[in-house]
Structures are given as C-alpha cells and as structure tokens.
Curated annotation (Swiss-Prot):
<keyword id="KW-0945">Host-virus interaction</keyword>
<dbReference type="GO" id="GO:0042277">
    <property type="term" value="F:peptide binding"/>
</dbReference>
<keyword id="KW-0472">Membrane</keyword>
<protein>
    <recommendedName>
        <fullName>LRR receptor-like serine/threonine-protein kinase RGI1</fullName>
        <ecNumber>2.7.11.1</ecNumber>
    </recommendedName>
</protein>
<keyword id="KW-0067">ATP-binding</keyword>
<feature type="short sequence motif" description="Small peptide recognition">
    <location>
        <begin position="398"/>
        <end position="402"/>
    </location>
</feature>
<dbReference type="InterPro" id="IPR003591">
    <property type="entry name" value="Leu-rich_rpt_typical-subtyp"/>
</dbReference>
<keyword id="KW-0325">Glycoprotein</keyword>
<feature type="repeat" description="LRR 24">
    <location>
        <begin position="636"/>
        <end position="657"/>
    </location>
</feature>
<keyword id="KW-0547">Nucleotide-binding</keyword>
<keyword id="KW-0675">Receptor</keyword>
<feature type="short sequence motif" description="Small peptide recognition">
    <location>
        <position position="258"/>
    </location>
</feature>
<feature type="short sequence motif" description="Small peptide recognition">
    <location>
        <begin position="280"/>
        <end position="282"/>
    </location>
</feature>
<feature type="short sequence motif" description="Small peptide recognition">
    <location>
        <begin position="470"/>
        <end position="472"/>
    </location>
</feature>
<feature type="repeat" description="LRR 1">
    <location>
        <begin position="80"/>
        <end position="104"/>
    </location>
</feature>
<feature type="repeat" description="LRR 21">
    <location>
        <begin position="563"/>
        <end position="585"/>
    </location>
</feature>
<feature type="repeat" description="LRR 23">
    <location>
        <begin position="610"/>
        <end position="634"/>
    </location>
</feature>
Amino acid sequence: MSLHSLIFFSSSSSSLLFSFFFIFIFCFSLSDAEQNPEASILYSWLHSSSPTPSSLSLFNWNSIDNTPCNNWTFITCSSQGFITDIDIESVPLQLSLPKNLPAFRSLQKLTISGANLTGTLPESLGDCLGLKVLDLSSNGLVGDIPWSLSKLRNLETLILNSNQLTGKIPPDISKCSKLKSLILFDNLLTGSIPTELGKLSGLEVIRIGGNKEISGQIPSEIGDCSNLTVLGLAETSVSGNLPSSLGKLKKLETLSIYTTMISGEIPSDLGNCSELVDLFLYENSLSGSIPREIGQLTKLEQLFLWQNSLVGGIPEEIGNCSNLKMIDLSLNLLSGSIPSSIGRLSFLEEFMISDNKFSGSIPTTISNCSSLVQLQLDKNQISGLIPSELGTLTKLTLFFAWSNQLEGSIPPGLADCTDLQALDLSRNSLTGTIPSGLFMLRNLTKLLLISNSLSGFIPQEIGNCSSLVRLRLGFNRITGEIPSGIGSLKKINFLDFSSNRLHGKVPDEIGSCSELQMIDLSNNSLEGSLPNPVSSLSGLQVLDVSANQFSGKIPASLGRLVSLNKLILSKNLFSGSIPTSLGMCSGLQLLDLGSNELSGEIPSELGDIENLEIALNLSSNRLTGKIPSKIASLNKLSILDLSHNMLEGDLAPLANIENLVSLNISYNSFSGYLPDNKLFRQLSPQDLEGNKKLCSSTQDSCFLTYRKGNGLGDDGDASRTRKLRLTLALLITLTVVLMILGAVAVIRARRNIDNERDSELGETYKWQFTPFQKLNFSVDQIIRCLVEPNVIGKGCSGVVYRADVDNGEVIAVKKLWPAMVNGGHDEKTKNVRDSFSAEVKTLGTIRHKNIVRFLGCCWNRNTRLLMYDYMPNGSLGSLLHERRGSSLDWDLRYRILLGAAQGLAYLHHDCLPPIVHRDIKANNILIGLDFEPYIADFGLAKLVDEGDIGRCSNTVAGSYGYIAPEYGYSMKITEKSDVYSYGVVVLEVLTGKQPIDPTVPEGIHLVDWVRQNRGSLEVLDSTLRSRTEAEADEMMQVLGTALLCVNSSPDERPTMKDVAAMLKEIKQEREEYAKVDLLLKKSPPPTTTMQEECRKNEMMMIPAAAASSSKEMRREERLLKSNNTSFSASSLLYSSSSSIE
C-alpha cells in the first residue's frame, strides 16, 4: 500500500471514528433527556396527594410524555433542556413543596403562589444556588424561614407573604447580596427587624407589615439601603421613634408605617425623600408638629397622618406639594386655621381634618381645588360663614362640617355641586332657610342639618330628591306643614323632623315611602289623626310622634307592622281604647302610650309581645279595669308605668315579671297586698302613692308571698315558709359540704395512685409524640417537669405545669384528667370523646394571633399531655383579682377585650366547621409578655357542624357564673353561649368583680347587679373611675356592648364578629360618619344600620317616673352607644348620646 493510500486510509478512519463518537454522545444525551429526572420529580410531586379534578385539568403533565421543556404547562426550560422556571399561580394544590428541589440544577425562578401549599420551608431550598426569584406567597406554609436561604447569593426576589410563617427574620438574609425585594408581610413572624438589612444596598422593596409580633425599634441602618423605593412596616408592634436616617432614602416612593407603636416626632429629614409619593403614618402615637419640610415633597400624592397626637397647625408649605391628591389629618390635636395655600393643590381629591381643634374660617381658596371629591371638616372649632365659592366644586360628593361654630345661612350655591351625595352641617349655628336647590340634587343620599337654628318651610321641591336615604332636620325652628311631595322619596329609610315647629296633618303620601325604617316627628305641633297609610310601611322599626297634638283613635292597622320595635305615641290627645292588634307587633321592645286620653281596659293581648323588654308606658290616661293576668308573660320587661289611671284590683299579675327594674303604679285604685319580692320591697313610696285601698292600715303587713298557681298567701304562711326554707338550706349546705370533702379525699387518693401508676407505666408503655411546631426538646424533658412545685393552674380538664426545658425555653404543659368511661378498653377507644381528643382536634387546625399557640402533644396509655406557649403574665382572672387589677389601666383592658373578641370571632366565623369554645372565662384568657390576650383551654371545645349545632350535651359546658342561662333548661350550646360568657368577662374587666362576688349586695349575679345600676359609672372598677371623660365614654360604650352579649335571649345577642367590630370602632369613634368613604358607596342600601343616627333624648323615650337625673341619663345613653356594625339597628336604636349623626 502506497504512502498516500495509507495516509488517506488513516485520515478516513479517524473521521469515521469521530463520527461514531459524536453519534454515541448524541444518543446518550437523547436517552438522558428521555429519562429526565426533573420531570419525574415534578410528576411524582403533583400526584403525591389527590388534587381536585379542576386543578389537575390545568396540568398536562403525564408520565408518558417525559419532556417538560416542550409541552408541560407552568414550566420553562433552557436551551440545554433543563428546567429554569416553575411558575404556578392560583391553582389549589394542597401539597407540600417538592422534596428534591436541589436536583433542579438550572432552576432560576420558583413561583408557587396561591396554591394552598402546606408544611414548612425545607432547608434544601438553600441548595438551589441558581435561584433568582423565590415566590411562595399566599399559601399555608408554617414554621421558620430557614437560615439556609442565605446561601442563595444570586437571589433577587424573595416573596413569602400571606402564609403562617413564624420565628424571626434571619439576619443572615443579608448575605443575599443581590436581593432587591424582601416581601414577608401577613405572617406570624416575631422578633425585631435585623439591622443587617442595612447591608443590602441594592434592596428596593421591604414589606414586613401585618406581622403583629414584630417589635423593637426601626433600625437606623435601613437608611443605608440607598436604592429602597418601598418600606412597609404597617400593622406590626415596632416602637420607638422614626429614625432620621430615613431621610437618606432618596429613591423612596412609599413609606407605610401605620397601626404600630411608634412615637415621637415626624423627622424633618423626611423632606429629603424627594421621590416620596405615599406617606402613611396613621394610627400611631406620633407627637409634635407636622414638619414644614413636608413641603419639599413635590411628588407626594397621599398624606395620611390620622389618629396620632400631632399638635400645631398645618404648615403653609403644604401648598408646595402640588401633586397631593389625598390628605387625612383627622383625629389629632391640630389647631390653628386652615392655610390658604391649600387652594394651590389643584389635584386634591380628599381633604379630611375631622376631630381636631382647628379654628378660624373655611378659606375661600379651597374652591380652587377643582378636583375635590371629599371635604371633611367636622368636629372642630371652625367659625364664620360657609363660603359660597364651594359651589364651584362640581366634583364634590361629600361635605361634612358638623359640630363646629359655623353661622350664617347655607349657601344656595351648594346646589351647584351636582355630584353631591352626603351633606352634614349639623350642630352649628346656621340660620335662614334650607335652600330649595339642595332637593334638586339627584345624587344626594344623606342630608343632615340637625341642631341648628334654621327656619322657614320644608321646601316643596323635596320630592325631586328621589335618591335621599336619610333626611334629618331635627332640632331647628322649621315651621309650616310637611309637604305631600315627601311621598316621592321612594328610597328614604330615615326621616327625622323632630323638635321643630311643624303643624298641620301628616300627609297620607308618607305611606308611599316604602323603605322607611324610622320616622321621628316628635316635639312639634302636628295634629289630626295618625294616617292609616303608615301601617303599610312593612319595614318600619321606629315610629315616634310623641309630644304633638294628634287625636282620634290609635289605628288598629298598626298591628300589621311586624318589624316595629319602638312605638312612641305619648303626650298627644289619642282617645278610645288601646287596639288589641298591637299584640301582633311581636318585635316591639318599647311601647309608650303615656299622657293621652285612652280609656277602657288594658288589652290582655299586650302580654303576647314577647320581646317587650325596654318599657311599657300606659301612664296618665283614663284606663280602667284590672291588670290582665297575661301581663305576667312579659318576663323580659324592664320598665312598667301604669301610674295616673283608674285601674283597680290586686297586683298578683306583676309578682313574677322577673326582670322589672322600675315600676310605677301610683294614683290608681289598686287594692290588697304587695307581692313579697325584691322589686316591691325596693319601691319608693312615690311609686305606690295614691292607691287608698292598697295596704290599708287595718292590715298587719303589706307584703304577701305570691305562689305560682296559688295566688297570695297570708303573712303567717310566708313566715312559716321562710323558716322552712332556711332549715332546708342549712341541711342542704351541710350535705353538700360533706360530699365535697368526701370527693376531695377520694380525688386526692386517686390522683396519688394515678401519679404512681403513670410513673410506673411511663417505662412500660411507649410515649408517642406529635409536634405541631418545630420543637427542640424531648418527652423526657417534659416528664421530669410534671411535679407539684411546677403546678401553675388546675381546670376542669386537667392540671397545668410550667416546664423549663434544656434549651432554655419555658412552655406550659397540661396533663389531662383520665377519661371517664364505662366498659372495656375497646369501648373506650371507639366511643369516648374526652377533652384530649377534643383539644388535639381543635388546636391542630387553628392559628390566630389571639389564640394560644399549640406546640404539640404526647401520650401513652395512661397519661396525655398538651403543650402550649408559656404566658408569663398568667391569666386575665389572676391579673384582675389576685393582683387587684392595679397593673391594668383602661388601654390595656381594652386591648385585652378586643383581642379576646377577635380570637373568639375567628373560632366562630373563620373556622370550618365553626368552633364553640364552651368555657370562656377570665381564667381561660391568658396574658402574654406585652399584655396581649390569648384564648386558651379547649378542654371543652366542641366542633360544630351543620348536623351537630344545638345538640344536647352530656357534660356540663362552662364554668359557674359564666354559663349562658339557656343551658339550664335546654342543655344546648351554640356560638351564642360563648357570646354570653364573653359578655360576663367584659363586665368582670370593667367592674373588677367576679361573676359571683362577695362584694355584690345580696350575692346576686354580676350581670343582674350591673343591670340594676342601669349604667351608672359607679359600677366601674374604682381604679377606672378617675379616667378622662373620653375614656369614661369608651368604657360605658364597652359596657353597653357587654349588656348586648348577656341578653337572656340567645337570638338577641350579637355575633362575635359584630362584637369585635363594635369594640374596634369604639376606640376610633367619630360618630356616624367616622372615616366614611362614600366614593365606594354611591347609593347606600336601605338596610344601613341606624343606631349611630339616633340620638334621641332618653327622657322622651321612657316614662317620666322611670327617668333619673339628666346626668344619670347621659351616662345611660353613653352605655349603649356604638358605631356601624352588622348587628341589628333596632338593638341600639335610641341609645346614642350624640345628637348628631
């Protein structure tokens, strides 16, 4: 073979060999792709549980097509065929994170958001070194943020918001040097904000808000994050001052630190944040003045500083913030006049300065704010005239200036504000007539002009304002007749013309106002008969025409008003008999027919009004006959006035109306004895005088015992009965004491045996341990702490121990009493639902900031243990009674009550199925280090599903003094039972007394004692009585909420969601329109609650004989005042002390 041929052959062989090698490598790679391990991991993960068919349908992943880079949804791959992005959003998977994430070697983006992920964040996440974006937001993840994330040096975005993550923010996160976004809001994180975050100079977004337990000061090092555009720390417990270093954040656009515990002054350095657009610092404890440097923020659009303690005035420089759209400075202590420079803010849409101390006049320059939509100036000291120039604000929808010192007339030009929806100028000194043009505003829903000195007629144009929902013109000097055009107000639900000088008849057209819920025409000079069309208003809840000159008969058709809860016809000239049809008004709570010319007998049908609980006033009429026996059915009634009539007969029907607190039967012709009960023995002579045949001088005693079904007995019978009762009481008491002593002895003996047995069986039977959190201790460490010196409490379900474990943690351990069973072990395993299984089942499914954190449980055959966070301040009960409440000022008590209400509302309304606690009491509300409340002891907790609610229980549910009354006769437990128990706790917190307290006269229940004292400030704990008037007002409102909770009828109690809402609003109460945004409610529905609108003088509501001094009445009115809630309007109607809504 020639050399040339040899060389050619050698060259060809090499090429052929290289080709074969390339084909082999390609085939190997293809085979590797077909056996893609990443695809197998994802497929196995997706099918590791049973996703819903609807969720699974969104995935086209299958085991046959093992090439995710070509076909699979939610997956993106690199050109080499490796997965780089997993992007799954809003798909309910209910899975934990894949276990083998480090196997995804090229993964750069992992987004699984809104997917109901469960479990914890695995440490292995830190091995996905290529990750740039990690978004696991809006899931159900628990546990700590793993420290291993600090190894992700390429990470730019970390989004873990809206989970249930606990623990601290890892300081080592600062090692992620490329991090731009750190978003952790709405979790359960604790601890302080790491100072190390200041090392992340590239950080653009920090959002940590909504973590209530994050505390400490805002680190000044945050100012070193020079690229920061968003800083969100709202709704946390950060405290201290705002660091001046925030002024170094030249790129900052949003500063959101509201609803925290920060204090001190607003640093003037914020004026250096030239890019700032949104400044949210409301609901804090900031003091000092608004810095003038705020005027340097020329890009600022939203300035919210409401509910702080700011003083001084609004700086004139604010007019330089030419882009401002919203200003809210309400609920501060600001003073001075409104600067005229406000008129330079041409983009301003909302200007709210309510509830301050501003004075001076409304500047006319404000009319230059041509974009203005809301103008709220209420509750200040502003004087002078309302500028007519306001009529040029054609976009204005809401104008509140009530409770000021304005004078002059209402400018007719306001009628040019064609978009106006709500106008409230109440409680000023306005004069003149009501401009007729206001009733030409087609969008006006609320017109309130209460308590001024307006005169003239009600404009005939009233019928043109068809959108009106609330019209309140009370307490003015308006004359003339009510226009018939009122019948065109088809949406009106609240009509108040009270305390004016109106005369003539009420037009029949009022019956066309089909949405009316309240009519108040009291204190006028109206005459004629009550128009029959009123009876067609099926939704009417309150009808008050008292103190007029109405005559004729009371229409029998009023009986058709089944929604009516207050009917007040007193101080008129009504004649004839009381219609028997009123007995059909089953919802009536107050019936006042006093001071008329009514005759005939009291109809027995009034006894059918089962909800009549406030008052029945029939005084000062010409009624005759006897008290019908059916009146005894009014067992809820509080006030009864039958005085100044011609009634006769005995008082037997009144003997068993158990809830009566006020009774006046003076100046009648009653005869016989007085029923021998507590009410009659406490009556004053004035309530009985004028009855010549009652308790005549020939009788030895005025009191006789009334026995149901047997009438009145004589005095000798009463004496013998009392002696017999005393003898029986002594015998029963002695028997009970002996039984208790015997039971204690037996229990102690059994407990000693059980302790010995547990000690022995602890070695024989294996312990099982189920943690619900990440725990660093063993069962052995817990067991050795279960000794008598460590006992910190005993309850109906077990003994609670303090356990100091080796890692320095302190936890609380409840050792449950053994289950009481009948039968063998198999029957016990199958049938018994003791407190252990109830607590584990309940606590394992709930997480809330005001419910004690359940750490885990462990058990063997004889011993069952539950582990919780330890609460260093003990229980609410111990703080109130063992330490005499000295450490609890009003603010702390309020916070505890609100937190407990929110926790209980979570159990009732946010758990599926709802959870009834069954043993709410002061000792089951634990107090944390910062006096935050935690609901504890679910030993009697019961899951309530649709088939179980209201079912009779076989065990006593609750603790003595806290148990709802219906349990005694029905054995039924519902959420409303918890509401009652919570109401008792509120009374306990306010009064400082236990439910059954030795200091309460005659040993009556706390609820009854508070009711008897009718809202007097004297019921408050002595340490609270010296508080400010504003705080006293809050306390009396909370007391009123408590009385709603302890209503004897479960159906009449509010829900815990309503209670929490009422309590929350009491602290920030701004009467009817506190923080209302009518931009979001263009046409409020007719069902809007009315309690905040009703400021009726209580003296006009109840019989004169039942009224006390005006000071006492003001206290009682404060008692039930509350703001907007979903609770029924009727329950709070006529309870506000305010005359303005």
